[in-house]
Amino acid sequence: MIVRNEAHIVHEVLDCVAPYISTWCIVDTGSEDGTQEIIRAHMAGLGIPGELFERPWKNFGHNRTEALQLAAGRADYIWIVDADDLVIGTPDFSQLSADSCELRYGPPDGFTYWRQQVFRDGLPWRYGGVVHEFIQCDQPFQIQRLLGDYHLESRRLGGRNLDPEKYARDRDLLLVEVERDPEDSRSVFYLAQSYFDLGDFANARRWYQRRAEMGGWEEEVYYSMLRVGESMLRLEEPWPLVQDAFLRAWESRPTRAEALHAVACYYRQQGRFQLGHIFAQRAASIPVPPDDILFVWAGAHSWAALDEQAVCASNLGQHSEAFSIFRNLLAGDKLSPEDRVRVAINRDFSVPTKLEIATAYPAVGIHTTRPRSDADVTVTVSCGPNPHNAEATLNSVLNSCTDRSRISRLVVDDAELSEADRTALRHRYPLAQSLDAPFREPAAARLRRISEGIQTRYWLHIPADWRFFAPERLLSRLARVLESEREVLAAGVNFEDASELTGRNAEEAIVRRGAGTGRYVLTDMMPRGPVMIDMERLGKIGGVDSGAADVHGDLTARAIAAGLRTATLDEVLCVYVG
């Protein structure tokens, strides 16, 4: 490592690399903030031997090479890091066998690139370039890529990155290099990068174009062509020319999605949703290229193009497509907290259409569907006095539970309906059975009566006037949550026991996942909305108390006393309309 004025941050990278190293060699190039003593003291505290050298600054290529030479003979491999790097996860170096090893920078679903950072000792390694240096060797060498659940985060917080003139200094150094060697494609590329980072998009476009025309490394050519399009877009050049630049970039490397995503994004912003949808759908079909190493925005492949496709589909009235994509994005872990809120809100725009579909009478299969021999869920639905609302609730349940063959019995608490309406309901829903209960029975007594008729392991209770709208294997999902969490009494359908669309999801830190569960969270309150209860665990706390003034509060208190918790799915799948 080479350092200069890194006192504010260097201890973090030292802590990160400590578990993996047996010695260290750090070159200070002129720190004036005490970096030298901080490093010596910190490594002594970690109990790792090593040596700090002080050498004058010349340029990145020279000083990196000097550091490599000073580290020679100390270990089997030399790991080059920067003072502001962090190691996220746990890299496994135990299988190192090649002469050089590439490490992943950036999270797997973010902006990712691979860099050679680990080198076998004893080979004639050196760095070239005055800035944006690159490794060279005077003899052939083998490279391997270190895969695994880790990445390095280059935080741009070191002394050099705090210099407001950093990009201008890089530009000036690279201009000298390009003048010295006009065919130095790497210097041309990073000169274009420096202009882009400075916001000088006219010069960035010029130098990216020059780099693209030089040919050579296909990934660098592609990225230069992509940046030509991005520079033209920032310069507000005519869209047909900008689009042509993006499409030429994609045509040069059709395994990359960034250019098509940029085109889709533009059309969506312009309200031209048909075209946006076409380009987004094509971009979303491209998997993350497994072998590319240069500035891969994996998010364009894994979620951002899908996001654009769903927004366009929603605006085109293709709500089933939009709803499905948004739900899949929310079910994953690729979205930032800010994007998760936005995607959840966008998903909810399609809910009115989904409700209209879900509450329609399920004519197909309603008279022929029979429970499986191993059906293990009893569904109970409470009804108010309005037969239309009762039918809408039943329709939404039957349409949304695509695994309804798991229903052993469908019991309808229809005491508040007229006799004529009850007869009509039984005719329209042959699977439904009426609950034999008196009119206007207290809530706790009614729930106790319902629970006493449950003969299955799982009980899904749906209070009156709820509407489901998301087709899925809901019964199986709720049951899997209860199977996965042995200390959970009940699993609610809606996050935060919401009764309306909220656009909210749980923070990633508290989300749980299991096979077939999707995202869910643990809570300590018995849901008042639709909920699946484990009847064995309900029996262990004495069942429903028919005399409780607040039946949900009573169940919550007794569950907590017995060491049981509750859970909810991490989304809203039904709404209350009463």
Predicted regions and their residues:
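A conserved acidic beta->alpha catalytic loop
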Residues: 16, 20, 27-43, 56-57, ...
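Short, well-formed alpha-helical segments that are part of the catalytic scaffolds
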Residues: 5-23, 386-401
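Glycine-rich, basic loop-to-helix element that forms the pyrophosphate-binding segment
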Residues: 55-73, 437-454
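"A position-specific structural signal for the A-helix of alpha-solenoid helical repeats
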Residues: 190, 227, 262, 308, ...
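Conserved donor-nucleotide/metal-binding helix-loop-beta segment in metal-dependent transferases, i.e.
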Residues: 90-108, 470-490
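Catalytic-site signature of metal-activated, phosphate-bearing donor transferases
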Residues: 61-68, 75-81, 85-206, 216, ...
